[in-house]
Amino acid sequence: MVRKPNSMYRNLAKKAYTRKEYMGGIPGVKVVHFDMGNLTSEFPMEVSLVVDESCQIRHSALEAARMSINRKLNKELGRMNYHLKLRTYPHHVLRENKQATGAGADRVSQGMRLAFGKAVGTAARCQQNQKIFTVFSNPASVEKIKDALRHGGHKLPSPTHLVIEMKQES
């Protein structure tokens, strides 16, 4: 089965379609982990990957970005020196009206009759300036974290930027 290009699903044109109790046959979410690295330690700094535009991010794109960022951080810093958090969940169900192609397709195809479509995947609906990934770590490793998040941001459909915040001492 051919996957449609992301440009078909990128924009927030329609309402969210999330009521899974009314639907059948929704593919599972590909995102495996939402928290990675050292989950117990408190770190003084956080670096976040933020989307510049409102968009829908497919679950496969979130998983690809997560794997890229986590692999780079694990290799550069070691598993105990960071905490990576994915801050969004793909609730929105994507639909596609399948079209028959090839010889004799016009006899089999329904065209636009009953064109509601079947569920083909899920996506996270993100607003402008929403944090997608956050890495908690020490200030000494900020350059390596920025590099890893920049690489992961290339796998997302919207332009991104980084926000660095230090936790307040109380």
UniProtKB/Swiss-Prot annotation:
InterPro entries on file: Ribosomal_uL16, Ribosomal_uL16_arc, Ribosomal_uL16_dom, Ribosomal_uL16_euk_arch, Ribosomal_uL16_sf
GO biological process assignments: translation
CDD domains for this protein: Ribosomal_L16_L10e (cd01433)
Cellular component GO terms held in the UniProt record: ribonucleoprotein complex; ribosome
Superkingdom in the source lineage: Archaea
Gene3D superfamilies the record matches: Ribosomal protein L10e/L16
The entry's keywords: Ribonucleoprotein, Ribosomal protein
Molecular function GO labels: structural constituent of ribosome
NCBIfam families: PRK04199.1-3, PRK04199.1-4, uL16_euk_arch
Similarity remark: Belongs to the universal ribosomal protein uL16 family.
Record-given protein name: Large ribosomal subunit protein uL16
Species annotation: Methanospirillum hungatei JF-1 (strain ATCC 27890 / DSM 864 / NBRC 100397 / JF-1)
